[in-house]
C-alpha cells in the first residue's frame, strides 16, 4: 500500500512541477492561481506520503541549515525594515516559495527517470519560449526597445532564463549519441543562442562565453572553444551593425565607471546603494522592492544633484554680464533593486543577510562541483556539469543585475532542486549497492 502511494504521489508531483515550470515560463507575471494550485498539489503529495508512512519525511541536505539561517536573518532585518509589513510579505510570498519549491522537489521526486523527464520538459519549454520570442521579435508582436523579450517583458529576464538552461542543453548534447536527440538539441541550442543574441544583453553574452569555455575545458571538448570563436568571428560579418556596436562597448573598460553611456543608470544606482549601505550596515533597510524603490529615490536624487551642481550654472562673460545656463537634470528611474545581487542583499538585509546568502550559495556550488566530479553515471555527469555551468552563468549576471527576485529566483531554485534530487538519488543508489 505504501509503495503505491509513494509511486502515485511522486508521479503527480512530477507532473505538477512540469506544469509549474511551464506556467512560470509562459506567464511569469500572471496565472498566480494556477501556480499556487501546482505548488499546493506538490505539498499535498508530500503530506499524503507522510500520512501514509506515519512519519516525518524531510531529507537532510547540506542546504537545510543555510536556508534556515537565511530565513532567520531575513526575518530579523524585516522587523528593522522601513515597511515591516511589506518586508514580511516579501519573505512569505517570495523567499518561502523558493525554499518550499526546493524541499518539495527533493522530498517527492524519487528516481533518475523522473529527473530526466522533468529536464526534458524544461528544455522543451525553454525552446518554445525562445521560438515565440524570435517570432515576436521579427514580426514586431512582442518586442521592447528593439530587443527580444518573449514572455518576460524585459530583455534581461529572458537572457537570464536562457543563460541558466542553455549550458544544460550543451552538456546533454555531448551525452546523447543518437541522431534524433542530437538534432533536437542542436535546434534548441540554435534557437536559444539566436534569442540570446537578439536580447542584446551584454552581460549574458559574456556569461555564456565564459560558460562555454568552462564546459570546453571541464568536458575536455576543446574543439567547442574553437567552434565558439569561429561563430563569433562569423557573427561580425553577418550581424547588423547595432549588434557589433553593442559588442564593442564591452571592451571599453575605461568608460565603465566614468560614463553612463555603457552602464546607464547602474552607476548612480550603485553609488546610492553604497550610500544606503553605509547608513544601514548591519540590518539594511529590509527586504522588498518597495523599500528599495522609496529609499533609492531619496539617495539618488541627492547624489545626482551634488554631481550636477558644478554643471548647472555655466557662466559666460558677454558684454560684461553673467549669463546663467542651466542643464536639465535627467529624471531618476524608480528602480526596484540595485542591479547587483550583492548590493541587493547588503541594502535589503545588511551584512548579516549577505553573509547568510554567501553561505547558502557556497554550499550550493560546493555540492554541485563535488557531485559532478564524483558522479559515475554518464547522464548525471553531463547534467551536473550543465547545472554547474548554469550556476556560474547566473552568478556572472549578478555583477550587473539581480537574480534574487521572481521569476528569476524561481527558475534558479528549480535547477538547485534538481541538483540536490540527483545527489540524493545517487546516495540512495550507493546505499543499495552497498547492501
Give a label for each model feature.
Residues 1-76, 82-86, 110-120, 172-183, ...:
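Transmembrane signal-anchor hairpin modules in multi-pass inner-membrane enzymes, especially those
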Residues 13-21, 65, 336, 340, ...:
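Loop-to-helix entry and N-terminal half of a specific, functionally important transmembrane alpha helix
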Residues 18, 39-45, 212, 226-230, ...:
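Transmembrane alpha-helices of multi-pass inner-membrane enzymes
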Residues 20-21, 42, 71-78, 100, ...:
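Alpha-helical transmembrane segments of multi-pass inner-membrane proteins
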Residues 31-51, 91-103, 157-166, 206-213, ...:
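Membrane-embedded alpha-helical segments of multi-pass membrane proteins
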Residues 63-70, 84-107, 117, 123-126, ...:
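Aromatic-anchored transmembrane helix interface
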Residues 131, 139-140, 194, 216-262, ...:
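A membrane-periplasm/extracellular boundary helix in multi-pass inner-membrane enzymes
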Residues 267-336, 342-345, 349-356:
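TM-adjacent membrane-interface loops and short helices in multi-pass inner/ER membrane proteins
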Amino acid at each position: 500500500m505504501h509503495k503505491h502511494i509513494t509511486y502515485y504521489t511522486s508521479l503527480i508531483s512530477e507532473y505538477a512541477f512540469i506544469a509549474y515550470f511551464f506556467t512560470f515560463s509562459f506567464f511569469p507575471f500572471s496565472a498566480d492561481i494556477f501556480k499556487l494550485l501546482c505548488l499546493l498539489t506538490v505539498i499535498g503529495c508530500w503530506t499524503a506520503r507522510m500520512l501514509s508512512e506515519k512519519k516525518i519525511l524531510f531529507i537532510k541536505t547540506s542546504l537545510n541549515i543555510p536556508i534556515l539561517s537565511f530565513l532567520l536573518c531575513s526575518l530579523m532585518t524585516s522587523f528593522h525594515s522601513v515597511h515591516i509589513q511589506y518586508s514580511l510579505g516579501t519573505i512569505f510570498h517570495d523567499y518561502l516559495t523558493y525554499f518550499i519549491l526546493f524541499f518539495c522537489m527533493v522530498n517527492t521526486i524519487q528516481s533518475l527517470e523522473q529527473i530526466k523527464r522533468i529536464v526534458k520538459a524544461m528544455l522543451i519549454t525553454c525552446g518554445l519560449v525562445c521560438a515565440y520570442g524570435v517570432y515576436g521579435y521579427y514580426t514586431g508582436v512582442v518586442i521592447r526597445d528593439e530587443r527580444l523579450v518573449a514572455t518576460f517583458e524585459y530583455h534581461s529576464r529572458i537572457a537570464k532564463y536562457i543563460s541558466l538552461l542553455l549550458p544544460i542543453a550543451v552538456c546533454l548534447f555531448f551525452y546523447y549519441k543518437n541522431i534524433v536527440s542530437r538534432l533536437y538539441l542542436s535546434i534548441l541550442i540554435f534557437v536559444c543562442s539566436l534569442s540570446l543574441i537578439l536580447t542584446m544583453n551584454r552581460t549574458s553574452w559574456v556569461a555564456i562565453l565564459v560558460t562555454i569555455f568552462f564546459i570546453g575545458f571541464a568536458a575536455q571538448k576543446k574543439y567547442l572553444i574553437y567552434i565558439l570563436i569561429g561563430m563569433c568571428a562569423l557573427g561580425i560579418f553577418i550581424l547588423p551593425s547595432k549588434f557589433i556596436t553593442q559588442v564593442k562597448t564591452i571592451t571599453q573598460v575605461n568608460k565603465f565607471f566614468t560614463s553612463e553611456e555603457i552602464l546607464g543608470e547602474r552607476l548612480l544606482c550603485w553609488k546610492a546603494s553604497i550610500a544606503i549601505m553605509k547608513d544601514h550596515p548591519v540590518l539594511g533597510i529590509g527586504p522588498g522592492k518597495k523599500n528599495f524603490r522609496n529609499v533609492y529615490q531619496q539617495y539618488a536624487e541627492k547624489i545626482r544633484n551634488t554631481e550636477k551642481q558644478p554643471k548647472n550654472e555655466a557662466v559666460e562673460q558677454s558684454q560684461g554680464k553673467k549669463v546663467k545656463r542651466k542643464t536639465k537634470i535627467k529624471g531618476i528611474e524608480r528602480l526596484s533593486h540595485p542591479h547587483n545581487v550583492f548590493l541587493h542583499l547588503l541594502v535589503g538585509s545588511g551584512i548579516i543577510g549577505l553573509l547568510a546568502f554567501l553561505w547558502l550559495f557556497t554550499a550550493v556550488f560546493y555540492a554541485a562541483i563535488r557531485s559532478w566530479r564524483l558522479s559515475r553515471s554518464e547522464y548525471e555527469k553531463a547534467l551536473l556539469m550543465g547545472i554547474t555551468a548554469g550556476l556560474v552563468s547566473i552568478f556572472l549576471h549578478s555583477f550587473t543585475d539581480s537574480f534574487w527576485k521572481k521569476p528569476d529566483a524561481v527558475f534558479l531554485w528549480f535547477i538547485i532542486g534538481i541538483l540536490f534530487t540527483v545527489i540524493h538519488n545517487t546516495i540512495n543508489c550507493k546505499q543499495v549497492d552497498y547492501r
